[in-house]
Design a protein with these regions (language model features):
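Secreted/periplasmic carbohydrate-active enzymes, especially glycoside hydrolases
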Residues: 1-154, 160-162, 166-170, 191-194, ...
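Acidic, His- and aromatic-enriched active-site or binding-groove loops in soluble protein domains
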Residues: 172-176
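Conserved beta-strand edge residues that scaffold enzyme active sites
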Residues: 154-155, 177, 249-251
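Short glycine/proline-centered loop/turn elements that form peptide/ligand docking sites
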Residues: 178-182
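Active-site neighborhood of glycoside hydrolase catalytic domains
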Residues: 165, 183-274, 283-284
Length: 286
């Protein structure tokens, strides 16, 4: 689902991945609003796996203020029989990241204040139950957060759904962290593809994270640079609607070539924790 806002309306491109369709079958595309009312519908031959639907007077997904979601359904139809059908929720919104104004959601400044979240519990590990995910997001919202960095790996689909529903702005990333391994390139590529494909329809996600603190010394490793270029280019090819970022540590110079690869520069600072003191945060924030 790729929505594009056009004035008061939205044009939504839908791409379907289909195998083993018969020549006489067709695809029926339907969009329903949050109340279940049909707002757009079209159909194509089964061999045409892309369609564009128009949503008049579109209701925007507007973060915590109004996290409005539509539901799209695509049905494979043979005669009068529905052979198969899939559905997904999505939201329509615009965003940009401005160096002076910060994060802009639907044309308005939308300050981001948030946390990093690990999918982990004592005695449970990574195998969280739905109630644990709900408790996490309730605590995060209670803090007044507007954004979450989902560190540093793919999280449960249920939590991405909760983020869509609650209007959190999300940074999603792969587990490419701490040190670069030349023999791990194909793994990073595979995980990046999976992250984008599996989570493409979530309106809460605005940036894809390529790596986390992969070096403390900058870009002396050409293979590391090339790996990041490959990931960055691949993400932009797969998704032209979102931005890329990496998380770097304070010691890396902001002009380092490695830091300049993604769209957004993001720093992890630990002043007063691993080193220094909290007063050192001020100059960076200024």
């Amino acid at each position: 689902m790729t929505p594009e806002i056009k004035g008061a309306d939205a044009s939504v491109e839908v791409e379907v991945f289909l195998t083993n369709a018969a020549a006489d079958q067709k695809l029926v595309y339907t969009v329903k609003d949050a109340e279940g009312k049909e707002v757009a519908k079209t159909e194509t031959a089964a061999g045409e796996t892309k369609a564009v639907l128009s949503i008049p007077a579109v209701h925007l997904w507007n973060g915590k203020k109004d996290p409005y979601l539509y539901t799209a359904e695509v049905a494979l139809v043979s005669g009068e029989e529905t052979v198969d059908a899939v559905s997904t929720r999505f939201g329509c919104r615009t965003f940009e990241i401005d160096p002076e104004r910060g994060f802009i959601l639907n044309g308005e400044e939308y300050p981001l204040r948030g946390v990093s979240r690990h999918q982990d519990r004592w005695g449970i590990g990574n195998a969280l139950l739905p109630e644990h995910h709900r408790e996490d997001i309730d605590l995060i919202c209670e803090l007044g957060a507007t954004t979450i960095r989902l560190a540093h790996y793919q999280h449960d689909q249920y939590f991405y759904d909760l983020c869509d529903e609650r209007g959190l702005v999300i940074w999603a990333e792969i587990p490419y962290i701490s040190s670069h391994m030349p023999n791990g390139r194909e793994n990073t590529i595979s995980q990046m593809k999976e992250l984008v494909v599996q989570n493409y329809n979530h309106p809460s996600i605005v940036v894809w994270g390529l790596s986390n603190e992969i070096t403390m010394a900058g870009s002396s490793d050409e293979d590391l640079l090339e790996n990041h270029r490959i990931l960055n280019d691949m993400v932009h090819e797969m998704d032209h609607t979102r931005l890329t970022t990496i998380a770097v540590v304070s010691m890396c110079d902001i002009h380092d070539p490695y830091i300049q690869i993604p769209d957004v520069i993001s720093y992890n600072h630990y002043f007063g924790w691993y080193g220094g003191d909290v007063s050192m945060n001020g100059p960076w924030m200024d």
